[in-house]
Each structure stands twice: as structure tokens, then as C-alpha cells.
Regions:
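Transmembrane alpha-helices and their extracellular/periplasmic helix-loop junctions
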Residues: 150-240
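Flexible inter-domain connectors and hinge/loop segments
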Residues: 1-179
Length: 240
């Protein structure tokens, strides 16, 4: 089966997306990370649909041009793409040097029933990429390991991919909080009660967005807060 190991860099040179599949004519092509995951899962259930890729019983929804705060041009959304979910440093893939493997200088449990990817990490190979965390660039083989890990976590641990609200519902969300601030300021005249009400409302907004974040749901936080503050300030200025 045909495949590829290309990375998609954003226009600022940072690697945030994983292109897992696309069609060349009628022929589906799958990424290295997706094919490795398929072999590890020992499944033949892999297919490309117009808006998603299905691996076994897990659906990988396609990243759209207007998905959340991560905006793309139409030319950047070809194929099936997902946002890369980099692990925290203490859960990053373990690395073994060539000499460690040759000399047996490692714990066999590190590789038992695990995916092992062999590649270069030397800077001289110029296979280095910038991640959203900044700092030193990351070798391509480590990026591939991140990609495989994310796919397997999604399938085996049912860890959800990032989900996004439709654009119209994001507008409604921002409008509701903007109007909420206006109503509070218009109806409440006592300064202390007004201040407490606005603080509680802001905390409620941030808490809802945080719960969404923990559930891998992108909810526009900053625009809603700005809308709340803007209408609050406008009504206060009007009343004074």
C-alpha cells in the first residue's frame, strides 16, 4: 500500500498538524504514522472518507479551514489532517542510542510490546523541526513517534482528538456573553453588586472554557471575554 512520511509546516515554520491520509486520484495514501499504528493494532479496518479517516472503530475527523482559533487557508487543508497533540516532557517517547542497542545496554521492558522506530537524531542530518514548545528543534523520528503515540492513544485509550464548534455556534457563544455583560450592567445599579456579578460571570465563562479544554473541546475564550468587557464598558459609559 502506498504511503508517505511528509510533514506539514505552518507558515511560521512550526509543526502543529499531522497529515494522516489523502487521495491521489482514487488511490488512498496513508501516512507513516497511520500505517505503523495499523500494523501495531493488527487490523485491516482502515478507510478514507470525505471528512474523516476510520481506523478500526475510531474516527479521525478532518481539520477544517475554520476549526476553532487555528485558522487555515483553503490551500492548506488538503487531505485528512489532525492537530498534533504533543505529550508532556515526562511522557515523551524514550530514546535509545545505536550503541546502547548493540551492547544490550537497556531494559528489554522498554521495547517489549512497544512500537520501535529507528532513525537519525544527529543535527548533521538536518531532519529537525520546530514544535509549538519552542526551544531546540525536534528530530523527525521523534515527531513520527509522537504521531504514532497520539493515534494509538486515540484508538486504545479512547483519548478524544480536539473537537471544534461550528463557526455559527462560536458567533452565538460570543454574542450571548456580550449581551450578558450588557444586561448585567443595565439592570444592576449598586456598584458592589455590579462588581461581584461581573466577577462571578467572568469566572463562570473561564470555568466553562476550562472544562471544554480538559474535554478536548475548543471553545473561544478570549473573544467571549473581550465581548463581555466591551459591552460592559460601553453600557457603563452610556449610563454615566
Amino acid at each position: 500500500r502506498g504511503g508517505f512520511n511528509n510533514f506539514l509546516l505552518d507558515r511560521d515554520g512550526i509543526l502543529r498538524r499531522n497529515l494522516i491520509a489523502f487521495k491521489l486520484g482514487k488511490q488512498p495514501l496513508y501516512s507513516f504514522s497511520l500505517q505503523i499504528s495499523k500494523v501495531y493494532l493488527d487490523t485491516e479496518e482502515l478507510s478514507v472518507k470525505p471528512d474523516f479517516v476510520q481506523l478500526d472503530s475510531t474516527v479521525f475527523a478532518d481539520l477544517k479551514a475554520d476549526s476553532g482559533g487555528y485558522q487555515l487557508s483553503q490551500t492548506d487543508v488538503g487531505g485528512t489532517q489532525i492537530l498534533l497533540d504533543y505529550p508532556v516532557p515526562n511522557k515523551a517517547p524514550r530514546k535509545l542510542s545505536f550503541s546502547q542497542v548493540i551492547n544490550g545496554d537497556y531494559n528489554p521492558r522498554l521495547i517489549k510490546n512497544q512500537v520501535v522506530i529507528v532513525g537519525y537524531t544527529a543535527p548533521s542530518k538536518k531532519d529537525l523541526f520546530q514544535t509549538p514548545f519552542g526551544g531546540a528543534k525536534t528530530p523527525g523520528v521523534v515527531i513520527h513517534a509522537h504521531m504514532v503515540s497520539q493515534i494509538l492513544r486515540t484508538v486504545l485509550a479512547q483519548k478524544p482528538l480536539w473537537r471544534f464548534l461550528p463557526q455559527w455556534s462560536e458567533f452565538v457563544w460570543i454574542w450571548v456573553w456580550s449581551m450578558g455583560g450588557a444586561v448585567i450592567v443595565w439592570r444592576i445599579r449598586h456598584p458592589l453588586v455590579l462588581g461581584v456579578s461581573l466577577i462571578v460571570t467572568s469566572i463562570g465563562l473561564i470555568s466553562l472554557c476550562w472544562v471544554g479544554f480538559l474535554s478536548s473541546i475548543w471553545i473561544p475564550t478570549t473573544p467571549a471575554i473581550l465581548g463581555l468587557l466591551s459591552t460592559t464598558g460601553a453600557i457603563l459609559a452610556y449610563k454615566t
